[in-house]
Amino acid sequence: MRKTLLYLLLVITSITASAQNKREFRGAWIQCVNGQFMGMGTQQMQSTLSYQLEELKRDGVNAIIFQVRPECDALYASSYEPWSRFLTGRQGMAPSPYWDPLYWMINECHRRGMELHAWINPFRAKTKNTAELASNHIARQRPELVFPYDGLFILNPAYQENRTFICKVVADILKRYDVDGLHIDDYFYPYPAQGCVIPDNFEFSSNNNGFSNISDWRRNNVNMFIKELHDTIEAVKPWVKFGVSPFGIYRNKKSDPKRGSMTNGLQNYDDLYADILLWVEKGWIDYCVPQIYWEIGNKAADYKTLINWWTANCTNRPLYIGEDIERTVKFGQQETKHQLHTSLLGHNSPLQGTVLWYAKAAVDNVGGYGTNLRNIYWRYPALQPLMPFKHGGKPGKVRKVKPIWTSDGYVLFWEAPKSRNYINAACKYVVYRFSKGESINIEDPSHIVAITPNTWYNLPYENGKQKYVYVVTALDRLSNESAKVKKNIKL
């Protein structure tokens, strides 16, 4: 019986691993707003983040979404907004010893072959538990631009000045930091709170932009912001990916019989005034990550119903699913959800990845979640999904591929391809290994041994009698892959 169970486990593992796609977004959110870094010194926070990144890489994660602006503040050096209290414990106080978490995280992610997406909360200016704002905070300097709501401060989306300010903050990030993506989450107009009313009747009556319905007017305010942010990114660094992670329900069918889902919950369109599908259809965003945090069988918002709805409706841009690790483990649904993802992933489907909420739960291996990722579901590395709507070219081939003995052992070296412009330049390389005589199929991710920013790879030399074929390709900023270069090597 024990042998039979072991055999079945090996078969399941083999089938699951072989079904992995070569291209898949495997992200994880690292948030600061939960206070996990407060009270840490520079060295402890760097050590904590290094450990998290190492564990996430082992789990197969290839992109980190790092929160850098939770309440019109900054986890990076900014001339526009104060240092975040979620970094130092007091808003406006610089870290000591001094460091720049965003700059540091970019370097740490890139050297591990991972992308770094800077995550901002665009309109939230104060969280409920923030008692003191720095003197240079926008709510202190320009209080007329924000409104209070259920203990929060919100930058009023009705003001063009606010939309312009957020775009200026983003442009500053893009100009000074080598980020791969710019990410915003589900906070637009505030989540409805009992007894609270959004105080924007004056703005609506004085500047309604031709709208007679205040809900349509609010949606238009957010739409204008999304379009302006898209245009800002395109103007500054067109290769940077713009992603949005909305609440998991667009509209319920009872509100919209044609485009609503068979759900009964809060709605992006009606309650947060966020018309996600419009942004996807217009091409204003580059990827969409709905937060489908419920379990399969949830009566108000069934996971399977929602993942199928988003796959059917979010068709003009890559779709990644926001996954709640703790809830998935609680209901014992990791295998079932993964099988559902696998059945929907593919070249003809908008579903092209997953983002884990939240990174620390994977690092802590809640319910064995991380173990299953690294050993079964994400056993092999994955490249990022293609985005031909941003750029469809590819880098040239690597040059002068050659194994050389060094003081560090046997090392495979190559030179970067020549490039005509920055967007086509190689920024990472993929190294594949095949046994001698084996078919060279670089679409099979089981042959990937490294995704690296370096122009070398340390070879696992044994006795010099085993023959292998190594293949090296180059990736540009959008993970377009070059033609392959082969090298026969004895190890």
Where are the language model's segments positioned?
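Beta-strand-rich modules
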Residues: 459-481
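Solvent-exposed loop/turn segments flanking beta-strands in beta-repeat/beta-sandwich domains
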Residues: 417-443, 484
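Catalytic domains of carbohydrate-active enzymes, especially glycoside hydrolases
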Residues: 47-74, 176-179, 278
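Active-site-adjacent "subsite" loops/lids of carbohydrate-active enzymes
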Residues: 29-31, 35-47, 118, 122-172, ...
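Pro/Thr/Ser/Gly-rich low-complexity, intrinsically disordered linker/stalk tracts
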Residues: 368-423, 479-491
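Substrate-binding cleft of secreted/luminal carbohydrate-active enzymes
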Residues: 273-299, 314-389
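Aromatic- and acidic-residue-enriched segments that line the glycan-binding/catalytic groove
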Residues: 74-89, 124-149, 186-209, 254-266
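Active-site neighborhood of glycoside hydrolase catalytic domains
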Residues: 162-169, 175-184, 188-262, 266-303, ...
